[in-house]
Swiss-Prot record:
Ranges for domain v-SNARE coiled-coil homology: 138-198
Gene name per UniProt: Ykt6
Pfam family, one: Longin
CDD domains per the UniProt record, alphabetical: Longin, R-SNARE_YKT6
SMART domains per record: Longin
Natural source organism: Rattus norvegicus (Rat)
This protein's name: Synaptobrevin homolog YKT6
Effect upon mutating F42E: Mistargeted to Golgi and plasma membrane. Normally targeted to vesicular structures
Subunit structure: Identified in 2 different SNARE complexes; the first one composed of GOSR1, GOSR2 and STX5 and the second one composed of BET1L, GOSR1 and STX5.
Ranges of residues in domain Longin: 8-131
Length: 198
């Protein structure tokens, strides 16, 4: 998972104005970096110009995903990432950056601003911090831990059963479970297997 670009634009009519951008082109060869960076800026600008105010979208281009968020006040953000990067985390980043940007940069500077004149230095920090979505986004971290716990629980249950033994056989032989509990287990098992086939 990788983030390549994080940019802030003002969606003017008809052109979008680049206000600030951060790039991570370290994975490209030295001679390709400036061209790749220019192409990312061009693509981001084009996506903002063609997106409606108050919208969010993800646009696929080869193995990359461009996530765009255009606010109703014409401030827009674009993240370019690989296709494995979680969309939810990308949009969380965009929302955070645009909120921060709108508080730090005066609104009258947006239509006439440029990367040289806008004083907002947090983009590089956000780009590097969000390279690992699990560390940057608490929900991703919790989801990853939950997935690991599910795997451990599944492996533990499987390891408790002896070779060739099935949970159904253990339930039917159990002296601890009452008749009603056994009937409940069988009914639940049938319903779950029915849904799994569909």
């Amino acid at each position: 998972m990788k983030l390549y670009s994080l940019s802030v634009f003002y969606k003017g009519e008809p052109k979008a104005v680049l206000l600030k951008a951060a790039y991570d082109v370290s994975s490209f060869s030295f001679f390709q970096r400036s061209s790749v960076q220019e192409f990312m800026t061009f693509t981001s600008q084009l996506i903002v110009e063609r997106s409606a105010k108050g919208s969010r979208a993800s646009v696929k281009e080869q193995e990359y995903l461009c996530h765009v968020y255009v606010r109703s006040d014409s401030l827009a953000g674009v993240v370019i990432a690989d296709s494995e990067y979680p969309s939810r985390v990308a949009f969380t980043l965009l929302e955070k950056v645009l909120d921060e940007f709108s508080k730090q940069v005066d609104r009258i500077d947006w239509p006439v601003g440029s990367p040289a004149t806008i004083h907002y230095t947090a983009l590089d920090g956000h780009l590097s911090r969000y390279q690992n979505p699990r560390e940057a986004d608490p929900m991703s971290k919790v989801q990853a831990e939950l997935d690991e716990t599910k795997i451990i629980l599944h492996n533990t249950m499987e390891s408790l059963l002896e070779r060739g033994e099935k949970l159904d056989d253990l339930v039917s032989k159990s002296e601890v479970l009452g008749t009603q509990s056994k009937a409940f287990y069988k009914t639940a098992r049938k319903q779950n297997s029915c849904c799994a086939i569909m």
